């Protein structure tokens, strides 16, 4: 199932033209409304008129997490306060939280891309869906919530906590879909078993998991213990929240909503753009965001990008599984090692 075939199945030439137009509009918008970007572009001797197509994105400056912290709370905001209708924030555990303002159009885009994700997973308006991410400043809860409503399914805003009650609701209400972190899904499975229930006692069939790293081994365990199909859901608070990319039934990478979020892969060392298929740092430009648009935001996430039409019918670029972060890589005897690889090995050991 495809929510928006006009965008998700767009030809590459049409997508290139759309992205080019949106990038031109974005650059003009931030140049005139965000002093941070205007100063950066002037220092690089780049005028908005120099950006003629999406291919010119390499001329533009990067944005980093530190830039967001240095401009706390609202210096990167492009829309006037009167147009900001909601604010979310990151945890800020290592400094100032990242404050992200959303306009009404931003929220409409967010619910649209989340509806694409849920439809790709197989959720329909006939489903009852539990949103078990945290609500509040964290983007997970409300992001998934309004996507479910946009799709037309019934949303149960369970959030987190009181897991036994949650399981009873899943059983009694016939909840068929759930969005939560993969670690909470495993805790749900553990609690289900402690309550003396089996996976056959509940009706979960689809799970959307994200907001933290997880492995293929975790996917297999979640599917086996909860009796559902587990899908990856990717997003960042700085970019939008959940809904930036999503797996389809083929589960061969995650489709990026690239009409709204333009992806690049760069070398963390040289900052040069890398070709499709090469592993590097994932970078996003928010092509349509009004509240706090970002140019070439360095996510620090390491993955690959995969072009080409998918067997599901979608034509959007896919991103591979996140293998680690450019800021947590260890070099052991000349080999790059990521914590996620260690976790994968540990999970294969039965005693764990």
State what each model feature region is.
Residues 1-89, 94-112, 119-120, 125:
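Nucleotide 5′-phosphate-binding alpha/beta core
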Residues 2-14, 18-31, 35, 151-352:
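Active-site glycine/GP-rich loop and adjacent strand/helix microenvironment
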Residues 37, 87, 114, 145, ...:
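Generic structural marker for isolated residues within well-ordered, non-membrane alpha-helices
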Residues 95-109, 145-154, 175-179:
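Acidic/glycine-enriched edge-of-secondary-structure segments
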Residues 97, 128, 327-329:
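Short, solvent-exposed beta-strand edge segments and adjacent coil->beta transition regions
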Residues 107, 134-136, 183-184:
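Short glycine-enriched loops at secondary-structure junctions
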Residues 119-155:
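Conserved AMP-binding loop of ANL adenylate-forming enzymes
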């Amino acid at each position: 199932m495809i929510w928006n075939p006009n965008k998700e199945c767009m030809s590459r030439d049409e997508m290139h033209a759309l992205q080019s137009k949106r990038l031109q509009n974005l650059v003009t918008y931030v140049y005139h409304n965000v002093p941070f970007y205007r100063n950066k572009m002037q220092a690089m001797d780049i005028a908005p008129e120099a950006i003629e197509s999406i291919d010119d994105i390499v001329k533009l400056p990067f944005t980093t997490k530190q830039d967001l912290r240095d401009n706390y709370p609202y210096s990167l905001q492009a829309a006037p306060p009167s147009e900001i209708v909601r604010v979310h924030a990151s945890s800020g555990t290592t400094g100032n939280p990242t404050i992200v303002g959303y306009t009404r159009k931003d929220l409409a885009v967010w619910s649209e891309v989340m509806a694409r994700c849920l439809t790709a997973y197989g959720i329909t308006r006939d489903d009852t869906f539990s949103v078990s991410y945290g609500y509040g400043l964290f983007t997970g809860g409300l992001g998934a919530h309004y996507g479910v409503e946009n799709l037309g399914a019934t949303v149960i805003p369970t959030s987190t906590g009181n897991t036994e009650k949650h399981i009873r609701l899943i059983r009694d209400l016939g909840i068929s879909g759930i969005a939560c972190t993969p670690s909470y899904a495993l805790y749900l499975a553990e609690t289900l078993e402690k309550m003396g229930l089996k996976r056959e006692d509940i009706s979960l069939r689809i799970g959307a998991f994200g907001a933290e790293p997880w492995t293929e081994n975790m996917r297999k365990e979640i599917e086996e213990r909860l009796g559902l199909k587990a899908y990856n859901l990717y997003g960042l608070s700085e970019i939008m929240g959940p809904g930036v990319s999503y797996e389809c039934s083929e589960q061969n990478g995650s489709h990026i909503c690239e009409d709204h979020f333009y992806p690049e892969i760069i070398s963390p060392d040289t900052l040069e753009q890398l070709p499709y298929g090469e592993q590097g740092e994932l970078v996003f430009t928010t092509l349509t965001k009004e509240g706090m648009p970002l140019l070439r935001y360095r996510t620090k996430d390491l993955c690959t990008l995969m072009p080409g039409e998918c067997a599901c019918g979608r034509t959007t670029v896919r991103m591979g599984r996140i293998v680690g972060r450019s800021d947590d890589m260890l070099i052991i005897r000349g080999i790059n090692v990521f914590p996620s690889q260690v976790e994968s090995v540990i999970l294969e050991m039965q005693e764990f």
